[in-house]
């Protein structure tokens, strides 16, 4: 008990000394030991790394989970060391609603069939999103969070300890300075004409006491300097480790980009498949359109919007004499466009023809396009002046 009281009193004294030194430094009444420029640069780089890592981490979490309530729930589960429950993605939820709507409205109707196809695509998109979130969390968010909760806490702890060692060192310097000033004043030879013998004896005794105080202050200063240098070296090594942290975060960033690229490639592939499915059945749903299918036309459901679509083209009259699909690419000059089956299209991007059967395109130019029976729905016949050739639908904006 006595030992604990002595330790408590000693700790309280050290804390008070540091508080006094810190306050005097803030008011400019005490000298402060400055760190070298390289050390200050290391501190600044570490602080910048920590701040930007926090921002990137928070914004990536928002990207992966835009719902703030869901993010708070996941945070609480992690703090409680409990497994985060599986959550249905927005795409999967939309797929569920579309499937239920198709079941209620009639899965055999054109609208119901399309709802089923789109719901299956949305379900695949939701599964791809789930995989992307899982991969990005493991390969990118977890390393960033480990740095903030592990390495940075260690660095912060050692920096606080270095700050305390510096305050102790500066307090020892101030104490030594005061002791030397008092010693110099005490060793001043008194004037025997004005000083009584008794005061002279007291002055000599005080000089001896201040000599002991100076020796004690010098010893404390040496100890404080040694501890400060040791702690500065430990902190310096940790701060220099930030370079390794940057290398690790760079690798994690590459992994994040790779997972994001895979995710968007999967989404593109799923949507392209869906577009082909919808395009192959569009001619059967909307009469007066042709996309390369020979299915019989159904009664019209509604008038089409004047906005452009990539797969809707006027039907070619059956009376037109055209070359077989195998020979269409070789005899394009012999193919006459139908009188009522052409449309205008604006070119979205430059396109370089791969062979003589294709037509090179320039962005923003207007061309005439139409479809031929049996053609790939991703291609149309384009005409510009006397030139004619196949053009990809994705490079065009069909005008009403």
Swiss-Prot record:
SMART domains recorded: BAR (SM00721), SH3 (SM00326)
Gene3D superfamilies: Arfaptin homology (AH) domain/BAR domain, SH3 Domains
Annotated positions of the Phosphoserine modification: 10, 400
InterPro entries, A to Z: AH/BAR_dom_sf, BAR_dom, Endophilin_B2_SH3, Endophilin_SH3RF, SH3-like_dom_sf, SH3_domain
Localization (cell): Cytoplasm
Subunit architecture: Homodimer, and heterodimer with SH3GLB1.
N-acetylmethionine modifications at: 1
Annotated protein name in UniProt: Endophilin-B2
Alphabetic keyword roster: Acetylation, Coiled coil, Cytoplasm, Phosphoprotein, SH3 domain
Region Membrane-binding amphipathic helix, residue ranges: 1-27
């Amino acid at each position: 008990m006595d030992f604990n009281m002595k330790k408590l009193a000693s700790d309280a004294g050290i804390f008070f000394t540091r508080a006094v030194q810190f306050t005097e430094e803030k008011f400019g009444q005490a000298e402060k030991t400055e760190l070298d420029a390289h050390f200050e640069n290391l501190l600044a780089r570490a602080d910048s790394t920590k701040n930007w890592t926090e921002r990137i981490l928070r914004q990536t979490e928002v990207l992966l989970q835009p719902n703030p309530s869901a993010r708070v729930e996941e945070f609480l589960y992690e703090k409680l060391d409990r497994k985060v429950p599986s959550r249905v993605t927005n795409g999967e939820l939309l797929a569920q609603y579309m499937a239920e709507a198709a079941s209620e409205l009639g899965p055999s109707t054109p609208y119901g069939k399309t709802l089923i196809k789109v719901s299956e695509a949305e379900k695949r998109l939701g599964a791809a999103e789930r995989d992307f979130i899982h991969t990005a969390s493991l390969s990118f968010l977890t390393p960033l969070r480990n740095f903030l909760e592990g390495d940075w806490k260690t660095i912060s702890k050692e920096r606080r300890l270095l700050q305390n060692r510096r305050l102790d060192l500066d307090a020892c310097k101030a104490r030594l300075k005061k002791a030397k000033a008092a010693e110099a004043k005490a060793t001043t030879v008194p004037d025997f004409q004005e000083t009584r013998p008794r005061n002279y004896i007291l002055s000599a005794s005080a000089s001896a006491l201040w000599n002991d105080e100076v020796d004690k202050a010098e010893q404390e200063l040496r100890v404080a300097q040694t501890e400060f240098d040791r702690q500065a070296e430990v902190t310096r090594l940790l701060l220099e480790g930030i370079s390794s942290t940057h290398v690790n975060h760079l690798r994690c960033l590459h992994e994040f980009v790779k997972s994001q690229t895979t995710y968007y490639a999967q989404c593109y592939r799923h949507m392209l498949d869906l577009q082909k499915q919808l395009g192959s059945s569009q001619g059967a749903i909307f009469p007066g359109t042709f996309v390369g299918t020979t299915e019989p036309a159904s009664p019209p459901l509604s008038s089409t919007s004047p906005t452009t679509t990539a797969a809707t083209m006027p039907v070619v009259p059956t009376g037109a004499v055209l070359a077989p699909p195998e020979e269409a690419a070789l005899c394009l000059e012999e193919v006459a466009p139908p009188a009522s089956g052409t449309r205008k299209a604006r070119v979205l991007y430059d396109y370089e023809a791969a062979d003589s059967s294709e037509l090179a395109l320039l962005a923003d130019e207007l061309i005439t396009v139409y479809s031929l029976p049996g053609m790939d729905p991703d291609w149309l016949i384009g005409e510009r002046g006397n030139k004619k050739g196949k053009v990809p639908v994705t490079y065009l904006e069909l005008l009403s």
